[in-house]
Swiss-Prot record:
Keywords, sorted A to Z: DNA damage, DNA repair, DNA replication, Ligase, Magnesium, Manganese, Metal-binding, NAD, Zinc
Annotated PROSITE patterns: BRCT, DNA_LIGASE_N1, DNA_LIGASE_N2
Cofactor(s) of this protein: Mg(2+); Mn(2+)
InterPro entries from the UniProt entry: BRCT_dom, BRCT_dom_sf, DisA/LigA_HHH, DNA_ligase, DNA_ligase_AS, DNA_ligase_CS, DNAligase_adenylation, DNAligase_N
Enzyme class, spelled out: ligase
Residues annotated for Zn(2+) binding in this entry: 425, 428, 443, 449
Protein name, per record: DNA ligase
SMART domains, A to Z: BRCT (SM00292), HhH1 (SM00278), LIGANc (SM00532)
PANTHER family: CHROMOSOME TRANSMISSION FIDELITY FACTOR 18 (PTHR23389), DNA LIGASE (PTHR23389:SF9)
Keyword Flavoprotein: no
Amino acid sequence: MARTQAEPPASQPDARAAWLRDQLERANYAYYVLDQPDLPDAEYDRLFGELQQLETDHPDLVTPDSPTQRVGGEVAGGFTPVVHDAPMLSLNNGFADEDIAAFDKRVADALGKTTDLAGSVTDPVEYACELKFDGLAISLRYEHGVFVQASTRGDGTTGEDVTENVRTIRSIPLKLKGAHVPALLDVRGEVLMFKRDFARLNERQRAAEQREFANPRNAAAGSLRQLDPKITAQRPLSFFAYGIGVLDGMPMPDTHSALLDWYESFGLPVNRERAVVYGADGLLGFFRKVGEKRESLPYDIDGVVYKVNRRDEQDRLGFVSRAPRFALAHKFPAQEALTRLVAIDVQVGRTGAITPVARLEPVFVGGATVTNATLHNEDEVRRKDIRIGDTVIVRRAGDVIPEVVGALLERRPDDAAEFVMPTECPVCGSKIERLPDEAIARCTGGLFCPAQRKQALWHFAQRRALDIDGLGEKIIDQLVELNLVRTPADLFNLGFATLAELDRFAEKSAQNLLDSLEKAKHTTLARFIYGLGIRHVGESTAKDLAKHFGSLTPIMDASIEELLEVNDVGPIVAESIHQFFAEEHNRTVIEQLRAPGKVTWPEGPPAPKAPQGVLAGKTVVLTGTLPNLTRDAAKEMLEAAGAKVAGSVSKKTDYVVAGADAGSKLAKAEELGIPVLDEDGLHQLLEGNTP
């Protein structure tokens, strides 16, 4: 998109109105025609509201093509235009409680509702309340109960024919249920995509190496407006009916709630999250109830809709140019907003994960003022092409951490700077490393880094590590926050007086912890290695390292090639171990832990080198009775030669050694074509000769 003209100040209403019209029309085109929305709803609403106010204050600024005089965008090429028999109008918006009270008062006054001396309505208005779905509005046309046409809203007067695509939506009946159906019925409703279906669609997009959709609304709109209905058929779209256009051949239901019940009797999908309430208090009660469950709903909504329930009262209230007077959309606080990204810092997590964080000009979004937002990782920053100085879209939903969704490239300043991942931890100065095939970079100073301190201490004290009973998370929190412990080595410097002064820590608890620390000084090499918290080194790998090297120093000094010789240690684990011990800060803490009077363990000899003969790594099965060797003796000899002795025959078996009375294992070996040896053949293998 080309760069837009400079933003004129409010002191120039003519220029300001022209600029606002331009911004809104660009947004409409991107949303309705290109299916590539580039402006958050909150920003669109703000600009639209400003233009409305300008035109109210300066009526001479109103133009026939102003966005305030129509509903949406132009009809896209590739689809046949459809003129709606009844316009598909949008709704006016309300945001604050005061807006809802004012709406109720306008409606009550217009309907001549009676009030008491205090001005309160004694005969409150009856409203039908529904959800405001975040999808694409469409109209379904049924003739004598048979589905004949579907069209999008378009500009409210003329939409696009999407009949063949809508036929693929399984929730939409192609024929209405019941013996008595209208001669003509225009059903208004919303095409949307459920959250679970959206997640599955994006999984398929990733697997096919195709572009992912930003959100369910974009996915629904893009899927519905495919030129090839076969593509739409592969997309998991849903539909909810919520309104009516034209009806012929049957009387109109007396209320809106009755209309929705009527739709259900025809087999049309109608959302059950609806209610009939009275007055402003009833409206606000419904809004709050829905707000509490919003995040748990299986689909996205951006508010609720209020409609005067009685049809005769709707008719009395009528319409303004672009919206009905009898209805209002009550929108939740915007979940997306625009602001400027002023810097990108990195923060260090409890496990050493380095996360880029956007520092933002303050913006109100999702019900709170946001100044920071996560950028997840370096690859995400590159993929989204986010730069310092950009105007960015910030999203905050519920209690979810705010995130930067993307940048508006057309607003990018010439001096926008790319993000560069630091090479040293901003907290402790240790090296930042990123393992192959991992998206997250990490600080390698696990034992030393203050940001990882609590996690390192908690892991060190685990039952499978040093097993320091009584050192729980709450005690660790106090020790760290009072600056009594910086590294695991400091634990062994704690005294009774210090521990006894901790909050809610009695003298007996202090003594028990000291006894546990004294006991922890006598451990095993495997437990100590596990307690260091090396990434990808679990309890089993720690045992393998201890068994292979016998003592700690050879492990600390081992090359990646030497580490790869350890059982079940692959390239990623070897790289992680090597990085950990290459960091001087970690080696310093280990040296402190091994100081006199601290942690000790019995040293053992390194394991013998693995055999390299013809049996090394081979799988052998023993069956039957051998003339001179017991089965246990044969097994011991095979394992000493580097073979694995298995209990059953499979395609992975290399040899079967068969003696007298060999049974089904011999038959299975012959069936699979596996070499079968007698005792002499076994001895040849053990001597290094291939039989």
